[in-house]
């Protein structure tokens, strides 16, 4: 028994075809929106590629760009099908291709739904990518004379200023790395020698941070050196006083920014997915109602349209049987090919 059967007359079929034609062209615009969102996200990720550890984070924007292009192609084609649907001669040319086309549309909708889910689920992967990338970027901060790394200082400084953050997880991350180049250290100074000797790796570590960590909204002049030394500054206690540095780490700041972007894109993609599913259902009803017309020349006759020819369990069973037959057919072909090669080998 057909699932969700609906009776159509000529007037209803015309309205359905016209409505679907209009919806498909709206969906082309939606495809352009998906493409634009993917392109925008890719550009935003590229801007911070120096502080990202790998290219895995580009899966979502690349997927959005691809799905946007496919949406424009499929919906343009569907619009043409709907336009030709009520002309018996033109519809006859499309008829053999409609079932495979609808199957492709179903597959497209499944993939689009998965891409929308990925927009919400990529946070964990992005967090690890940003964490390792920022750690490496901070390590190369001092390499202003090294080719290929000389830009890293400016990149990190601009990042901390723009996102109002400091370090990877916080300002104390700067205490654990040498962020001042040896070029600007006076090795004849006793203080410099003592600091380097006191470190196992021979690094010059200080309880200080780059200028870009300073919060300009603070009324007090920025304390960026000897941050944990209360006696080095007048009326100062680093444990109780609100420091005039950005407290939030850059990983959290960037993660929040990209997560909000991808969550918004995920919502938009889900809404477009619902629209695409509606169009696919409408196309199925249009196809079955037109196929149900006994005589194409008598366009006024009534017909029935349905979503599935049989119930869901029966449809699923038939699908599994067709897959099994396909598998057996491939196996027989492979055995025949092996049998044909055996005499030649002899």
Swiss-Prot record:
PROSITE patterns in UniProt: RDS_ROM1 (PS00930)
Result of altering residue 220 to Q: In MDPT1; increased protein expression
Predominant localisation class: membrane
Recorded consequence of changing residue 244 to H: In cone-rod dystrophy
Record-level GO cellular component terms: membrane; photoreceptor inner segment; photoreceptor outer segment; plasma membrane
Stretches that traverse the bilayer: 25-43, 62-80, 100-123, 265-290
Substitution effect: residue 172 to Q: In some patients with macular dystrophy
Free-text tissue specificity from the UniProt record: Retina (photoreceptor). In rim region of ROS (rod outer segment) disks.
Effect of residue 172 to W: In some patients with macular dystrophy; also in a family affected by central areolar choroidal dystrophy
Subunit composition and interactions: Homodimer; disulfide-linked. Forms a homotetramer. Forms a heterotetramer with ROM1. Homotetramer and heterotetramer core complexes go on to form higher order complexes by formation of intermolecular disulfide bonds. Interacts with MREG. Interacts with STX3. Interacts with SNAP25.
Similarity comment text for this entry: Belongs to the PRPH2/ROM1 family.
Linked pathology: Retinitis pigmentosa 7: A retinal dystrophy belonging to the group of pigmentary retinopathies. Retinitis pigmentosa is characterized by retinal pigment deposits visible on fundus examination and primary loss of rod photoreceptor cells followed by secondary loss of cone photoreceptors. Patients typically have night vision blindness and loss of midperipheral visual field. As their condition progresses, they lose their far peripheral visual field and eventually central vision as well. Retinitis punctata albescens: A form of fleck retina disease characterized by aggregation of white flecks posteriorly in the retina, causing night blindness and delayed dark adaptation. It differs from fundus albipunctatus in being progressive and evolving to generalized atrophy of the retina.
The protein's name in its UniProt record: Peripherin-2
Organism name: Homo sapiens (Human)
Taxonomy of the source species: Eukaryota, Metazoa, Chordata, Craniata, Vertebrata
């Amino acid at each position: 028994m057909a699932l969700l059967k609906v009776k159509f007359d000529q007037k209803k079929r015309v309205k359905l075809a016209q409505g679907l034609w209009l919806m498909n062209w709206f969906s082309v615009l939606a495809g352009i929106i998906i493409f634009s969102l993917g392109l925008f996200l890719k550009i935003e990720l590229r801007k911070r590629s120096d502080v990202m550890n790998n290219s895995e984070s580009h899966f979502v924007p690349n997927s959005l760009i691809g799905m946007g292009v496919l949406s424009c192609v499929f919906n343009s084609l569907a619009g043409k099908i709907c336009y030709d649907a009520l002309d018996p001669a033109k519809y006859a040319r499309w008829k053999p291709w409609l079932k495979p086309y609808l199957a492709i549309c179903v597959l497209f909708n499944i993939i689009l739904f998965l891409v929308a889910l990925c927009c919400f689920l990529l946070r964990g992967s992005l967090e690890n990518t940003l964490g390792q990338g920022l750690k490496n970027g901070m390590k190369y901060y001092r390499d202003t004379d090294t080719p290929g790394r000389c830009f890293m200082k400016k990149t990190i400084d601009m990042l901390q200023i723009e996102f109002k953050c400091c370090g990877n997880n916080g300002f104390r991350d700067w205490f654990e790395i040498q962020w001042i180049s040896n070029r600007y250290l006076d090795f004849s100074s006793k203080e410099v020698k003592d600091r380097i000797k006191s470190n196992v790796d021979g690094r010059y570590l200080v309880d200080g941070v780059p200028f870009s960590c300073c919060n300009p909204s603070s009324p007090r002049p920025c304390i960026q050196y000897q941050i944990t030394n209360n006696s080095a500054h007048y009326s100062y206690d680093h444990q109780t006083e609100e420091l005039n540095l950005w407290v939030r780490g850059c990983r959290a700041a960037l993660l929040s920014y990209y997560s909000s972007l991808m969550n918004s894109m995920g919502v938009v993609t889900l809404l477009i997915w619902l629209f695409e599913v509606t169009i696919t259902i409408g196309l199925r009803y249009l196809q079955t109602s037109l196929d149900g017309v006994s005589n194409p020349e008598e366009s006024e006759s009534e017909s029935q349209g349905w979503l599935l020819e049989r119930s869901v369990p029966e449809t699923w069973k038939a699908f599994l049987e067709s897959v099994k037959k396909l598998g057996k057919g491939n196996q027989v072909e492979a055995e025949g090919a092996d049998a044909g090669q055996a005499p030649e080998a002899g």
